[in-house]
Amino acid sequence: MLPRPLVPLAFAALLGVTAAAAAGPPPPANEVRGWLLRIHDAASHRNFQGTFVVSGGGSVASARISHFYEGPNQYERIESLDGRQRKVFRHNDVVHTVWPASHVAMIEQRGLLNSFPALLQAGDDGLGEWYEVQAEGLDRVAGHEANVLAVKARDGYRYGYRLWADHDSGLLLRVDVIGEHGDVLETSAFSDVSIGVRPQPESIMQGMRKLDGYRIVRPVLTPTRLDTEGWVLRRLAPGFREVSCVSRQIENPREASADPALPPVIQTIYSDGLTYVSVFIEPYRSDSHRQPMLASLGATLTLTQRQGDWWITVVGDTPPATLKMFAGALERKKP
């Protein structure tokens, strides 16, 4: 398991809920979208450094995170502290992922993938139909007083969340993903964090420039449509809609070379405004595609299956029913 800070930290500051609001009645459902937009804004406009830990499914992983902003510019560094060393540097939408041991660096533009923060601005006015939000008082996380908010799923197609946000700044300190039976599937939390630190953008830019001796990988992402690629999705899980569809030219950044003959993979991303489902479509290859499976790691489920001459992979932080609905609704268009 790897920390996924762009997802929990994009929630990233509890909606600007004040102490008075935390002690008051549950907020109206129509305020959900406004809260989430304030989360996104607070995540972008806090300078902080800390250690972030993700645990779930018997696995634990941690990363050191620094986030700075100056005017319109955002800077971020994420360094894994477990397993194979990996560093991620971000300046606005440009992301460099660096593997020091193999001297490989992957450079991509996050905006092309419509990552989670962008989804909050994509017109998700119906969030209150799918989630119920309740304030749950105060707690402490990583030495900081925090407001607690419960985001409860209204149906079986999505999970719920419990959020802890710093009382003074609104920065998200912890998020639990809550399963269908009320169990905690995954916890993402700061074990230590300093908020309001002096921004050091040059430390991020230096890391992005120091690539001498590295093999540079630049994934080729081409916007496309399912129907253009010969596919149709007959139905969507309730509340989900398509937010991105790209053709990805796959290259393994850990290998010294890649097979240029490998066909591109079609990736379509769907979201209900809080969570996401990714559908990958690629030609079936007997040497790499084995038995169909449904596997979980923390809150993330992965479903794979063969469909004729194609291999389908569906990934999401959702209950199995959601992934099965997407996989079952995907059909190859008739000539």
Can you annotate each of these PLM segments?
Residues T97-A118:
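Acidic/charged, solvent-exposed loop-and-adjacent secondary-structure segments enriched in E/D, K/R, S/T
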Residues S115-L127:
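Short, solvent-exposed helix-to-loop capping segments enriched in aromatics
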